[in-house]
From Swiss-Prot:
This is Large ribosomal subunit protein uL16c. It is found in: Plastid, Chloroplast. GO terms for biological process: mitochondrial translation. Belongs to the universal ribosomal protein uL16 family. It comes from Pinus thunbergii (Japanese black pine). InterPro entries: Ribosomal_uL16, Ribosomal_uL16_bact-type, Ribosomal_uL16_CS, Ribosomal_uL16_dom, Ribosomal_uL16_sf. Keywords: Chloroplast, Plastid, Ribonucleoprotein, Ribosomal protein. GO terms for cellular component: chloroplast; mitochondrial large ribosomal subunit. Coiled coil: none annotated. One of its GO terms (molecular function) is structural constituent of ribosome. PROSITE patterns: RIBOSOMAL_L16_1, RIBOSOMAL_L16_2. Part of the 50S ribosomal subunit. Pfam families: Ribosomal_L16 (PF00252).
Length: 134
């Protein structure tokens, strides 16, 4: 699963997901894409599950580009721990997604195959998405 090799700081604030995505909201590499319509955190496991389903469905001559990367650590405290004694340890990584962000791009396949692959990958995502073309 995806995670940064090294970061400047081990822990981050949770932050707020306001507004729409102005970066990464256009198709750059392929002809078809899956675009987010809601704000959310998408975990590295969800990104990998979507990538695998697209690869499995569009394996004949198609190319996939994953346009998001999980760079935010999410901390959790051990179960049945008393309050206090600092912030928990990092458990998993997420990518902060705002509306309009391109999640995956596809090229080298027909539109029907790309649309079907994007629909299957959209079931793996915790947000509403839409299929877009160039």
């Amino acid at each position: 699963m995806l995670s940064p090799k090294r970061t400047k700081f081990r822990k981050q604030h949770r932050g707020r997901m306001k507004g729409v995505s102005y970066r990464g909201n256009r198709i750059c590499f392929g002809r078809f894409a899956l675009q987010a319509l809601e704000p959310a955190w998408i975990t590295s496991g969800q990104i990998e599950a979507g990538r695998r389903t697209i690869n499995r469905y569009a394996r004949r001559g198609g190319k996939i580009w994953v346009r998001i990367f999980p760079d935010k650590p999410i901390t959790m405290r051990p179960a049945e721990t008393r309050m206090g004694s600092g912030k928990g340890s990092p458990e998993y990584w997420v990518s902060v997604i705002r509306p309009g962000r391109i999640l995956y791009e596809m090229g080298g396949v027909s539109e029907t195959v790309a649309r079907a692959a994007a629909r299957i990958a959209a079931y793996k995502m915790p947000i509403r998405t839409q299929f877009v073309t160039t």
